[in-house]
Amino acid sequence: MKHLDLFSGVGGFSLAASWVWGKDHEVVCFCEQDKFCQKVLNKHWPNVPIVEDVNDVERIVTYTKRLGRWERGNTQTERNTEEVVMARQEPAERTRPDTGTDSAITLLSAGVPCQPASVAGKQSGTRDDRWLWPQTFDVVRAVRPRWCLFENVRGLLSLEGGMVFKSLLSELEAIGYEVWCFVLPACAKNAPHRRDRVWIVAHSKLWEDNGKR
């Protein structure tokens, strides 16, 4: 199980995934700019590369190349990456879903920065320079993971009357993903506070998984 971990923090997603998949779990790459977090990641996953900037799509994709993903000459995937990096078109115009299912990445996780949506802040949403959902989806388009898992604050649901959240889901669906959404409080896992969080789970329609999810 190959895992690409964006906005990794101190590795919570990767730690949880290792509990689930055990020895079958392998982190391919972290994306994290905080220096303290990088030290923690290097301590616990010393051989896993860290990319600091989520805008560096090409560098992130190189770590999927090392898994042999492009050995079969997936020209559609190459075009996807070129469009994302060079063209920067509007989301709906950037790419069409791949026609193949050779992505080496099983899971892409992302704790996308929550400050633009948090009710503790100004909820500037897409006007905030920390709004990094477009960059996250650029990586999704280029890598085409089988599964995506995103986490954010509940305030994401109410930005611009809910239109921003609907747009995020529509963009995932437009590039070939089936999407499920949940709001789960931390107290559901016995934490001593509520702390509601939005979870978005997306599965590539290109992977049938023998009818199983």
Specify the residue positions occupied by each region the protein language model found.
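SAM cofactor-binding core of SAM-dependent methyltransferases
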Residues: 2-58
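Extreme N-terminus of proteins, especially the signal/transit-peptide cleavage junction
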Residues: 1, 23, 99-103
